[in-house]
UniProtKB/Swiss-Prot annotation:
Alphabetical keyword list: Autocatalytic cleavage, DNA damage, DNA repair, DNA replication, DNA-binding, Hydrolase, Repressor, SOS response, Transcription, Transcription regulation
GO biological process: DNA repair; DNA replication; negative regulation of DNA-templated transcription; proteolysis; SOS response
Protein's name according to its UniProt entry: LexA repressor
Subunit field text: Homodimer.
Catalytic residues identified in the record: 123, 160
Organism: Haemophilus influenzae (strain ATCC 51907 / DSM 11121 / KW20 / Rd)
DNA-binding span(s): 28-48
Enzyme Commission number: 3.4.21.88
Length: 207
């Protein structure tokens, strides 16, 4: 089975839950209602995408004509955790920071992604990182000037372009409306580089 987008995984999970609780798959209208789609046509498009990726089989002519395919032999990855708010002094991948796990193959990114981070705001819009994107992050402390990094200051996580001059860190936005964040490592002890950006998922599509 080809990797699913976050939204496609939501639809597949709903199909499985419905089968477990009722013994039958949901209709397109039920999928739309439960997942907040505007119409049954939107549900149909997601089902077609799942079918193309080998997750389900659509049986023509039946409102509940959906069969989930057994892909257990092809399950070679566990997905990527989505990190939410973090607490100062705790590892970013601590269990209490994980909001969800998305069925995304870490090896699709180079270097390999270790977690996802939801982007808020438009401070990096000039390099195509937009509000609502899921940023794929490779965990590393080995970073170079000019790389887009995920940095943590106290309990705030930010995505910026790195510039280091001695003990001074400049975290540059890619939007002229935002000033750089300046960190003096001799004064700010609760500062960490958590990793580098290796890709994004936007609007439930691979970018």
């Amino acid at each position: 089975m080809r990797p699913l987008t976050a939204r496609q995984q939501e639809v597949l999970d709903l199909l499985k839950r419905h089968l477990e609780t009722t013994g039958m798959p949901p209709t397109r209208a039920e999928i739309s209602r439960e997942l907040g789609f505007k119409s049954a046509n939107a549900a149909e498009e997601h089902l077609k995408a799942l079918s193309r990726k080998g997750a389900i089989e659509i049986i023509p002519g039946a409102s509940r004509g959906i069969r989930i395919l057994d892909n257990s032999s092809n399950d070679e990855f566990d997905g990527l955790p989505l990190v939410g708010r973090v607490r100062a002094g705790e590892p970013i991948l601590a269990e209490q920071h994980i909001e969800a796990t998305y069925r995304v193959d870490a090896d699709m990114f180079k270097p390999q992604a270790d977690f996802l981070l939801k982007v808020y705001g438009l401070s990096m819009k000039n390099v195509g990182i937009l509000d609502g994107d899921l940023l794929a992050v490779h965990s590393t402390k080995d970073v170079r000037n000019g790389q887009i990094v995920v940095a943590r200051i106290e309990d705030e996580v930010t995505v910026k372009r790195l510039e280091k001059k001695g003990s001074i860190i400049y975290l540059h936005a890619e939007n002229e409306e935002f000033d750089p964040i300046v960190v003096n490592l001799e004064e700010q002890k609760n500062f960490e580089i958590e990793g580098i950006a290796v890709g994004i998922i936007r609007n439930n599509a691979w970018m």
